[in-house]
Each structure stands twice: as C-alpha cells, then as structure tokens.
C-alpha cells in the first residue's frame, strides 16, 4: 500500500479519518476487567490454592468452550445493531457521505513539497549550532506510538553504526524499502526526522599583531651608478681639458694588473718626498715625477689612458689641481736654514734638524688618508696609482704640534693614591701640592721595593710574606717597640677591617681570629 503522508495531498477530513481507521486497533487497547482480577488473584494465591485453581480451570474451560460457540452465533446476529453505536461505524458512515474536496480549500491545489502545519506547530528549533529535533504532536492513546509497528509484525531496529556513518559523511538518512512496513504504521511516525546541524566556525578577524614587515632591500644597479657618474663628470668638465679620463672609461685590467696595497704606496711616496727637493727651474716636472712614482709605472698608466680614447669625458676624482705652494715654501725654508745651521752649529744639530723635517713630511702625508672621503664602489676597481695622484694633489696642512709626552707607568700607578689623598683632605688641593704628594709617594715606594728586593734575594725567597713587610716597617721607623703594628691599624684603618686584623677575645678564652 502506498505510503500516506501530509505531503501527498490536502489534509481533508476524509484523509484524516481514513488514517485514523488505518492506525486504530481493531481490538480495544484496554484490558478486560476479568483479566485484571485474575492477575490480582494469582499474586494472592498460595501453592495449595494454585493446585485447586488449576483443577477448577480445566472444568471451567470445558464449560466456557461450549458457551463460546453459542455466543459467536449470537454476536454475528447482533453485529448489525451494535455497529451503529460504535465509533468505527460512525467514521465509516462519515467517509461514505463526506466529499472528496477539502472543506477549507474547495478546489484541490497541488503544492510541491509543502511542510505540514502539524509538523510546523510541533517543531522546536534551537539556537544555531545545536541539535535540531523535529517531533510530531502527541496523538490520543488509541493510536500507536511512533516507532512501534502493527501487531503481528517484527519490530525494525535502528542500527547506530549506519546512522553515525551517514551523519559523518553528511549524507541524508538512507531510505530503505518500506515493504516490511504495513499500512497500519502512522504517517506521523514516518515524518519523525532527526536533523543534525553542525555548528559553524565563527569568523575570526585575523590581526597582524606584532608581526613586523620584512625590510625591502633594493638591489644597487651598477650600470645606473656609472651612468650617473658619467653625467656628473660631463656637467662639471671644462671644454678645453683633453687629458682627463672618466673612471668608467679606464680599462678593467689596470685594476687587476697593479694590486699593491694603499698603505705601501703612501709609504713609498713619503720616502720619495724626503729625498727629492724641487728646483726653481723645473717645479712642475719634479712634482709630477714625485707624484707618479717611477717612470715605468707612469708610462704604463699613460699607455692605458691613451688606449681608452682622447674624446672620453673627464672624471671629477682625477682633476689636476695646481701644485701646493706651502710644502715647497716650507722645504725651501729648510734649505735656506740648513747652510746657516752648518756654519754656526755643530754636526749634532744638523742631524737632529733633518729627521725633524722628515717627520714633518711623513706626518703631513700620513694625515692625508684620514681627511679624504671614502671612495665610491665604481672607483674601487682602479689601481693604487691614480689614488696616489689624488692624495698628493690635495692641499697639505702643516702640523706644528710636537711629539706627545709619554706618561710614566710608575706615576700612572700612583694616581689612585693621589686621588685618595685629595679625597681625604675634604677640601680643594692645588696642582702643585698634588705633585709634591706624588713625589713623596714615588720615593716611598721606591725605597720599599728596593728593600724588598734586597731582602728576598738575601733570604732566597720568591714570595713576599707579611713578616717581611713588618721587618721593613721596623727598619723604616714606622713600627717601634712603643708603637706596634696594631696601633697603626687602629689609627689608620676603619672598624670593619680592624676587627678582622686585630685578635680580640669575645667569649671566655676563645679568641677571634685564631692565632
């Protein structure tokens, strides 16, 4: 028989009554009064009374069997009169007389997948993310409970394993063939559905927090840098200069051929500057020779520069400047002063004057690298020869400062005691007074060290002990028979050190520290 549900058609009176007749039991669900009385009697009877009851039952069954056969014939005859008074016959009469159309909606209108009103009223929807349970309305006790089958049919069990698998897979419940179910099962039981709605994950707003952005590192384009250098050199170049060559135009093998360090080139230049003195006839030629070094290196650099082409743009780093006048004047004055010193002074003064001039020239050239700015990456490819010319053509500064005074390490060790003396006076002390204190401390420590050295060598000791210092203090007159070492400690040491050095009895015969 086809499965009847609310979705098949309109809920008319006829369909409702038909469902009630199909689901209603032919027998009354109430137990007879005689069966309840018999159950109560069974509980109250003893084993002896049970035996008597069994004998009477057998006789009563025989009598009742004959009476039943007679009663059946009478029931068939009186069924016509009793059917008019039962609710079942009344419902059948209503079905025969009631119209097929609905009383609410006279014209039958088919609505696809319409939700029944009874199920809507009974549906209890919970909050989002929880279990939604749709239950039908409770029927009067005359109908069967949902999930129970009609009498005489086997109860169909629900397998939880299949149910859990389908819920995990997110598939609808399997619709097994309902051939085993009879037409007596109510449509309300078939509409019993369990729908599980999984809680949706809340939308979280991702915040970056303290995550720092990676630094954007831009690569340096060497070609663009060299192009900018060429543009700057073209803008700052003079129209008549043809001896200037740009840094980018020089061949790369120049930097690879001569790779001597920068410090050696400066040292060689400073040594050559000591012995080469300019003559008044050729001041510019000797300056160029002194700057460029030996002729072999100069010619090699000129050949490299001539290969690069005469029409190349000049570079601001290699612009020739006029030779400085101050070093020549200073050297010339030294030349004039040397004959005068030779006439009126001894040979010792001559030798002392020449190293002084050498020191002056070397100090001027040593100070030049510190004054120059760091070279750009494009210039680092060049050899050390152009750098020599750049450093030589910068104007030099004459340094008149004399040699630095070296501080005596012995006096440097006495400075803490001098500071301690100025602290103990609790008043400002002049510098001359502090110098006298330093001299006194120097003399005292010298005598003390000499005495310790003599005593240690005489006694053959390698370690100075407190007894040696006490003996020296006696010889110096600081410790005598009237003034002992403990008296000096009491006078010049604070209390916390005094308690550790001087033995004292604090409880009976126990002395601290132990002697």
UniProtKB/Swiss-Prot annotation:
One of its GO terms (biological process) is chromosome organization. Residues 29-44 have a biased composition (Basic residues). It holds the Pfam family CENP-T_C. The modification Phosphoserine is found at residues 313, 333, 345-346, 357, 376. Keywords: Cell cycle, Cell division, Centromere, Chromosome, DNA-binding, Kinetochore, Mitosis, Nucleus, Phosphoprotein. GO terms for molecular function: DNA binding; protein heterodimerization activity. InterPro entries: CENP-T (IPR028255), CENP-T/H4_C (IPR035425), CENP-T_N (IPR032373), Histone-fold (IPR009072). Residues 94-375 are annotated as: Flexible stalk domain. Residues 45-58, 296-306 have a biased composition (Polar residues). One of its GO terms (cellular component) is chromosome, centromeric region. Component of the CENPA-CAD complex, composed of CENPI, CENPK, CENPL, CENPO, CENPP, CENPQ, CENPR and CENPS. The CENPA-CAD complex is probably recruited on centromeres by the CENPA-NAC complex, at least composed of CENPA, CENPC, CENPH, CENPM, CENPN, CENPT and CENPU. Identified in a centromeric complex containing histones H2A, H2B, H3 and H4, and at least CENPA, CENPB, CENPC, CENPT, CENPN, HJURP, SUPT16H, SSRP1 and RSF1. Interacts (via N-terminus) with the NDC80 complex. The largest part of the sequence forms an elongated and flexible stalk structure that is connected to a C-terminal globular domain with a histone-type fold. Belongs to the CENP-T/CNN1 family. This is Centromere protein T.
